[in-house]
Amino acid sequence: MAQKDVLTDLNKVRNIGIMAHIDAGKTTTTERILYYTGVNYKIGETHDGASTTDWMEQEQERGITITSAAVTCFWNDNQINIIDTPGHVDFTVEVERSLRVLDGAVAVFDGKEGVEPQSEQVWRQADKYDVPRICFVNKMDKLGADFYFTVRTIEERLGATPLVIQLPIGAENDFIGIIDLVEMKAKVWRGETALGEKYEVEDIPAELADKADEYRTKLLEAVAETDEALLEKYFGGEELTVEEIKGAIRKLTVNSELYPVLCGSAFKNKGVQPMLDAVVDYLPSPLDVESVQGHVPNKEDELITRKPSVDEPFSALAFKIAVHPFFGKLTYVRVYSGTVESGSQVINSTKGKKERLGKLFQMHANKENPVERASAGHIYAVIGLKDTTTGDTLSDANQQIVLESMTFPDPVIEVAIEPKTKSDQEKLGTAIQKLAEEDPTFKVHLDQETGQTVIGGMGELHLDILVDRMRREFKVEANVGKPQVAYRETIKRKVEKVEFTHKKQTGGSGQFAKVLIDLEPFSGEDGATYEFENKVTGGRIPREYIPSVDAGAQDAMQYGVLAGYPLVNVKVTLLDGAYHEVDSSEMAFKVAGSQVLKKAAQAAQPVILEPIMAVEVTTPEDYMGEVIGDLNSRRGQIQAMEERAGARVVKAQVPLSEMFGYVGDLRSKTQGRANYSMVFDSYAEVPANVSKEIIAKATGQ
């Protein structure tokens, strides 16, 4: 078997991803690739819920891909490592981390829909990491499929320059094959060839000859411009050889100047093998990618590089963690330089901790092929790493390097989750810890006010699936609340000399404490939200009781005076008071401190504050009006508008409470072509009418 040479000759290796909109047929395409490369003996269909890379139960049920499974396969003695990435907006973290470790990608488009919003978003993420791509126009057998329309949308919506290297023969039900513009031959799948393994190479059909010539000329012009020798040859009227054309297309693709466009129907098994040839012919090998940059641990200015060679010191990036039913934690790594054997010790240079590599596997979706050593340019799954999380670098202990990590957005939506029984409580803890290891965008905190566990994520679908996984993989039964907003309360004016006397003198030891305070709005340095100042003179209140007044005031602040939300940004000044030799105690002054704060706050114009989000919507020009109108109706304030890669970007500040369900509304208003991101910006006062509703809801009136 030629697998041995592949491990040493990196020219024959391709690390690629398959990226696309949610329904363009990524997973079906991946399945076909695995079938033709001989890894699978039975074709799995997304329709039947049996595809190889969708190995979580929910993926098979929902027919979408959530996690990126890494699969290794061979094609004409070349090794292709494929990462199947999800196309749904809530799983951007999966897409980001796959793109970070890929050398190239196949962008799959739906031949009827053209470039869809999710494709725009994933395309922009690929631009961010500068990943070379080839485009595969899929579903050419579908009603209404239009190859030329799709190519136009690649130009218009993505602002990219497509290079058409194949044309379809027929369309919809009559789609029977492709014209290869490089070799100027037709490749035809006749009849219902059971699995499309056999195709005939024929002359181009007469009725398509003109169209083929027109596109061939465009192709040759683009190719000739890459090199002066080719340019002279082309204008001198000489034929360019197939090798010369392929070499030039490869150069253009690797430099991300142009994106070759192919077509086919993965489901009908047409056009997949030529697409595999294109992956090998045009996408970069690990050697085409420049050496990776990193820095010395703890010294970010000292840059070092590692070349993609086995002779360099070992370095690798952990890009994904998955929980495996038998092995526990699997860490997926991309090795950038050097080699390492299973069982050796390496260092996690991001955290400065030693790690021992247990077993090493090359993965095939969820079957594992054990290997003895990991070497540069490949992707592996490792067992036995304890402290390594997504984005960490593993390196040779004597020659450490920290590679550039990945950036993950903060959660935008939170729900409270309560275990149904005591035994679920313990399981929930384990489940949350495991899921947080796998998914850096999943965050958890304990709500001090309600004692509930609150989980946060990238969107409603994201949280649905996480809760679903808790139920399935960890057998946790839990009730999930509605998405919540964290309000706060504060005061707007200063009140002076508010007095409160706490006394209880009916038989036995009594209680007595008298306090006098000023209360005023306050905003401290470095975000402090409370200050207590003592101005009592002449021992009017004994020293030991003063901290009790402070503690009482802080207790009262936890449940404000309007709707029970925490009171923030206040300053308490203790001016005067009185005590009783026998009846005063710490307890008495604590009660007095608490009551006087409530009394003062009620007089100081209390208001409710709400979290305001900075929202950024990227939309095609045609939907600008709808998007802006919709944001205004959500009490949003438009801050700015700009243009970016053929799309419009609207920036606005919108209260979080108005943003629930926005994903769905935005999709329906823009036919799914817009997308948005939001991050927390600040707290701001709630308008009076909204404030009334919040108070009524909280006090049950």
Curated annotation (Swiss-Prot):
Keyword terms: Cytoplasm, Elongation factor, GTP-binding, Nucleotide-binding, Protein biosynthesis
Xref: SMART domains: EFG_C (SM00838), EFG_IV (SM00889)
Organism the protein comes from: Mycobacterium sp. (strain KMS)
Family annotation (PANTHER family): RIBOSOME-RELEASING FACTOR 2, MITOCHONDRIAL, TRANSLATION ELONGATION FACTOR G-RELATED
Record GO biological process: ribosome disassembly
Subcellular location: Cytoplasm
CDD domains membership: EF-G (cd01886), EFG_III (cd16262), EFG_mtEFG1_IV (cd01434), EFG_mtEFG_C (cd03713), EFG_mtEFG_II (cd04088)
Name under which the protein is recorded: Elongation factor G
Major localization class: cytoplasm
Domain tr-type G: 11-287
Pfam family, one: EFG_IV
GO molecular function: GTP binding; GTPase activity; translation elongation factor activity
NCBIfam families attached to this UniProt entry: EF-G (TIGR00484), PRK12740.1-5 (NF009381), small_GTP (TIGR00231)
